[in-house]
Amino acid sequence: MVPSVMEGAPQLGITSTDTSSAGVPPGLKLIPTDRLDRRTDEEIAAWLQTRHPVTSDKNVWAFWHNGYTNMPPWVQRNIINWVRRLGPDWTVHLLDRVDGSATNVSHYVDSSFFPECFNNNTMDGPTVGQHSGDLVRLPLLWLYGGIWIDAGSFLFRHVEDICWNKIEDPESPYEMAGFVIEMRPGVEVMLNGFIAAKRGNPFIKRWLEIFKKLWDGATNVQGFHKHPLLRHLPMLCPPIDKLNLPPQGLNVVMEQFTDYMSQIMSFERLRKLVDPSDGFNGPEYYSNKMLLCSALQETFYFQLVTEWSGTKQFNLLSTKRKGEGVVKDENWHAAENFVHDALANTATMKLSHGPPGALDSFLADLWDSEEHHGKDNEDGTFAAYLRYGSVHFDQTREMVPIKMGWPDEEVLEAGVLEPKK
């Protein structure tokens, strides 16, 4: 039996009248209900645990290594809301590595795409789930096309409006899309939590080849920054001032941080590589064929305005918005501004668990804890209102892409899997 994901909270679906008294906030408009998936949350939850045929490139891919029923309830609600928001034209595939599961990734991707440690279940270390997801996402996009979204993400805008309409437009130069952030002073780096491309994309193919190669003989990512394919690249070092990080910065050694981000480092290799054997030009592709938007605006805006404090985010969203005893004090208005700002001005909200220990607190960790399992959707709170708005509101703003030029850093002329000499 599929467990309910509502934890006693009112259903987010079609009958809610949450905005009837407050009206629609500035920068937003109501989505007609006929554009939404009208099934109950329980029906969508059951549907997510069955295998669905791939009939087009309009796929949203996500992964949870030990399956839907082992997801924290807040993550389950994320995926359910994607299905409801995206409607019938898009298929959300939530894959796993559970033996006998109808949604096991092995039904979609041949073992030849994965390293030995993945196929033999010998990956180790504290980030097996995260890096299993890294290994899965690129083969899925290469084989089937669509959009990879990390399961810990809220979706505040339809994926067609974020990027897909432009990828599908024959008059548009764009073939891939994602979000970039300054990971070294003056250097914008594309993240891997939101990746869009049609099947057979040439950049995706080479990217997955590089990342898979890192895993030869490995069972975790430790030391990947020293791998022959990556060792010529500068290590990641996010600028504290530009990201509005806490004064102490990230509580992590940069070598370990760079290893954790090794799939992003594989991207970095490829975007600065020209392959003379087949003419592939990474800088040209990155500059002209990728639709890139600011991650600080489109996925980490909530972090930027709270100094990356999970505790601060938790307290804002746990604030009572309506009901008996509500006092509209300074904290209430801060919570309202936070939620309205997120709903109107950022495309997604990605909650992560790591790198482990990098920050003093992560909202994902707080919502993971059993004592807080319903806090992301507790009746009458701003968290529940954020959930409601993520399904029922459309943004009126236009997203503005960033134009990337030719990299200022060294461009490597070599084969995709050829180390720098």
UniProtKB/Swiss-Prot annotation:
One of its GO terms (molecular function) is mannosyltransferase activity. Coiled coil: none annotated. GO terms for cellular component: membrane. The keyword Transferase applies. It comes from the Eukaryota. One of its GO terms (biological process) is mannosyl-inositol phosphorylceramide biosynthetic process. The keyword Secreted does not apply. SUPFAM superfamilies: Nucleotide-diphospho-sugar transferases. Keywords: Glycosyltransferase, Transferase. This is O-glycosyltransferase braB.
